[in-house]
């Protein structure tokens, strides 16, 4: 707690001032977390001061809040290119990232509990920079980081604004941003070192070395490229759902089975089901083999039944036997190929069709989906054309 508080003071995050009249004063609290390494071991214990952003009033102490993050398909595309050209892939972390964003609004906050000024106990903090928990915190941080990168000569992609590229002479660098977690890949290590040094002038940058663990995804170097999987995340999910002793199944769903909102008895408490399906949805980042099953389960979050819960547990049982399944990125061709398909009126509840597509860059799968169409197709041809339209839109 003391280290976090001192970091806030060093960063000139606020200055004390008398409590204003007719102004909203945001409360705060301390949040404690255990940071883990990729193997599940404890890295460090962390305390963070978090503002209670729900105290904020729209138009008074915040306006714009949107902040982009890197798209999963962009990450896969960049890693495929890095493997193909044998580029270095490094991971960076910015300490206390949200504290670097400059606030445009006038925001007041109570003094942190346990660190009140003994001389001015009733004073409040006038925030000069952002702090965790504020509604605009992610946006202010992204704007600050993107400005720093553009001053170094980087350009934001028009397709994915969290991808920044630098091209000069023979040097090429890609920077992928997900809040304060950053992937950097380049054709030269010297360029990466220079970037880290330049960013270090403004931020506390940690070079985490070769990419190995990013957003819960484990990245392993293989003889021909990279292997991405979420084995640790899947194991943690099985523990959380008390299914470590479950018998594995060979498939995530029963072939030909159709889930209906009318089948089974409604669950008295749908919390477990919703938590389970939400976690499974995150696993689809590296598990296209469960995308269809998870898409079906997501359609019953509002009123799940015991039949739906059994279907969700079947996916977990499938994961139990396929923990190391994931994506393999190998060197090879850079030809872009897309494949799509659709059923027709397959949903028993509303007779809408389900589309699916896979997009490969060479042999590397970089994008996929399984999704119910938004309208009822009047023929199988129409359903196929709609599926093709979504695929082409993703390609271009």
Language model segments and positions:
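Long, low-complexity, charge-biased intrinsically disordered regions
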Residues: 1-396
